[in-house]
Amino acid sequence: MTTAQLRPIAPQKLHFSENLSVWVSDAQCRLVVSQPALDPTLWNTYLQGALRAYSKHGVECTLDLDAISDGSDTQLFFAAIDIGGDVVGGARVIGPLRSADDSHAVVEWAGNPGLSAVRKMINDRAPFGVVEVKSGWVNSDAQRSDAIAAALARALPLSMSLLGVQFVMGTAAGPRAGPVAFFGGSNSSENPGGSIPGRALPDQDDLVGPQNLG
C-alpha cells in the first residue's frame, strides 16, 4: 500500500438523527450504532459495562471514566444488546486524529520499544483520516460471547465510511503480547501495526479491540 494513492481529508463531524441497528443472527444480539448525546441512557449503560469488564482485571484506571463520561470526545459508539435487552459489549470511536499526540497509544508506549513506529504510523496516515477505537469490551459471561466479539470487530470498520476517513486504529490487550496498534485502510487490508512490540498487561479475555479486525 502507498499513501500516494489516498487523498487528504478535512475533518467532519457526524450527527445521527436516530440510532442505527442491525440484528446479528450468529451472535444473537442487536448491534446498535449511536452517539452519546443522541442516546445518553445507552451510552451510560455501555460505559458501566466497560467499567465492570475492566475492573474485573484491575485495569479500570485505563478507562479514565471521569474524563470520557460526558461523551465529548466520542464521535460514535457501538453497543451489542442481547435478546434479554442487556448490553453485553461495545466500543467507542474518537477522532479524526490530527496527529499521534491525539492518540492514547503514545502514552501506552511511552518508554517502550515501538513508540517511534507508533508515532510514525499515525502521523503518516493522519492527513488521510484516522479514527481510533477505544474502550472495547464484551461480557465474557454472555452466551455466544465469542460471536459477539466477532460481530463488534466486523462492525468497527463501518466507522470509516460513516466518518469519511481512510483508516481505523486502536490498541488492545492480547493474552500474551500486550497492546499492539492495528490499522485498516479503506483501500487495503494491510495491518502494519502487527510488527510493533507490545507492552505487557494482565490477561484481559473480555476486553475486545482491533486485534480482531483482520
Give residue ranges: language-model regions.
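A short helix-loop-beta-strand connector motif used in the catalytic cores of GNAT acetyltransferases and
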Residues: I68-A79, D86, R98-D102
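Conserved acyl-donor/pantetheine-binding loop and adjacent beta-alpha core of acyl/acetyltransferases
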Residues: R92-N139
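Aromatic (often tryptophan-rich) hydrophobic motifs at membrane interfaces
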Residues: L115, V133, P157-M160, V168
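Short beta-strand micro-motifs in enzyme catalytic cores
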Residues: T74-F78, G129, A200-V208
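Conserved acetyl-CoA-binding loop-helix of GNAT-fold acetyltransferases
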Residues: R144-M160
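Catalytic micro-motifs at enzyme active sites that drive phosphoryl/nucleotidyl and oxygen chemistry
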Residues: D64-S69, F77, R119-N123
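Terminal substrate-recognition subdomain of acyl/acetyltransferases
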Residues: M1-C61, S69, G136-S140, S161-G214
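Glycine-rich acetyl-CoA-binding "A-motif" of GNAT/NAT acetyltransferases
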Residues: G85-G89, F182
